[in-house]
């Protein structure tokens, strides 16, 4: 068993050229059989493909990969993480709409960290023209060092400033998800819970990012449970050895589910119990930002499928 685990953590990362089907099959055998699965049910994860995983590869080369990772929608990332959001500006909405239709893909999300939470009116309008119920993910603004009652008051102030963006989300039928992020107002367990409690719009909630939380699978699952319907988006990404400094590729990939030490089982079982309807995005940050996580499109897709097999094993019937 120990040899099998070592093989899973090393040899798979070197076989970048194998097919996604082969990697998925190998992943299912990589030492996870001892972990408890969720009770069988009808729930299946609704995966969304992050364009940033492919760096600066063009959208035309990425869209065929959506179905290969068991997804139907794509999350467009702008610079510095990807270049696919900019393709709407350079190629035009009509061409991007045609590309999406050609591959049977829907626009499921747009990463809006650069725009911030208060400048989303145009992006919501764009999203409504290209898709339906599109999730815009961004960060919070406010005193990230506040605690206790001061933190709760800071979240209330943030929500007051957020009212125009909330109204736009409601008017356009979009979803606004605020990610818990280090050095952000929404970064601690308390801030996540209070934000979820204080939000009143059904179209606003949290993009849960385990990467920026203590690496405790039970804690992450508890936060998902406590958020309930305010949980709008899940990043399937762990901290691993971090994502700020250049690391050997094997260490960089420890952010991926099934590679690093974080147990995603509690979270996946909780999502199944909740019948979570939102997107789940298998994700990691390369260093430097904007490069593909691996050298080729097939290798990237295979790596995503490796993590997908690991996550799916927890909810397999």
Describe the function of each predicted region:
Residues 1-12:
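N-terminal secretory signal peptides
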Residues 21-29, 61-63, 99, 103-206, ...:
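Active-site acidic/histidine proton-transfer and metal-coordination neighborhood
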Residues 31-56, 64-65:
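C-terminal segment of N-terminal export signals and the immediately downstream linker at the start
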Residues 45-51, 74-76, 107-111, 135-137, ...:
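Hydrophobic faces of well-ordered beta-strands that scaffold small-molecule active sites
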Residues 50-54, 77-79, 112-115, 140-142, ...:
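Active-site beta-loop-alpha junctions enriched in small/polar residues
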Residues 62-79, 130-131:
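Catalytic domains of carbohydrate-active enzymes, especially glycoside hydrolases
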Residues 73, 167-261, 265-268:
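Acidic/histidine-rich catalytic cores of soluble enzymes
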Residues 76-95, 145:
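Glycine-rich, proline-tolerant flexible connector loops at the mouths of alpha/beta enzymes
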């Amino acid at each position: 068993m120990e040899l099998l685990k070592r093989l899973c953590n090393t040899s798979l990362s070197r076989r970048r050229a194998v097919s996604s089907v082969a990697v998925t099959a190998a992943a299912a055998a990589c030492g996870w059989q001892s972990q408890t699965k969720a009770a069988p049910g009808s729930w299946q994860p609704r995966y969304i493909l992050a364009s940033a995983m492919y760096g600066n590869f063009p959208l035309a080369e990425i869209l065929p990969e959506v179905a290969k990772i068991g997804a139907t929608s794509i999350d467009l990332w702008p610079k510095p993480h990807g270049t696919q959001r900019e393709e709407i500006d350079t190629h035009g909405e009509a061409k991007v709409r045609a590309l999406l239709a050609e591959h049977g893909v829907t626009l499921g999300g747009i990463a809006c960290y650069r725009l911030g939470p208060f400048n989303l009116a145009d992006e919501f309008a764009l999203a409504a023209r290209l898709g339906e119920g599109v999730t815009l993910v961004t960060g919070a603004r406010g005193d990230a060092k506040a605690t206790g009652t001061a933190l709760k008051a800071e979240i209330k102030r943030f929500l007051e400033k957020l009212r125009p963006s909330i109204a736009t989300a409601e008017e356009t039928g979009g979803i606004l998800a605020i990610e818990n992020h280090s050095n952000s107002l929404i970064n601690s367990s308390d801030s996540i819970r209070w934000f979820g409690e204080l939000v009143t719009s059904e179209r606003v909630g949290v993009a849960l990012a385990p990467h920026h939380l203590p690496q405790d699978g039970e804690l992450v699952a508890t936060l998902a449970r406590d958020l309930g319907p305010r949980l709008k988006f899940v990043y399937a990404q762990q901290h691993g050895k971090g994502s700020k400094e250049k690391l050997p590729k094997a260490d960089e990939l420890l952010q991926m589910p099934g590679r690093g030490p974080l147990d995603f089982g509690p979270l996946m079982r909780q999502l199944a119990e909740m019948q979570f309807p939102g997107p789940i995005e298998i994700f990691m940050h390369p260093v430097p930002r904007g490069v593909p996580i691996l050298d080729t499109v097939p290798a990237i897709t295979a790596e995503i499928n490796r993590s997908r097999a690991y996550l799916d094993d927890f909810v397999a019937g």
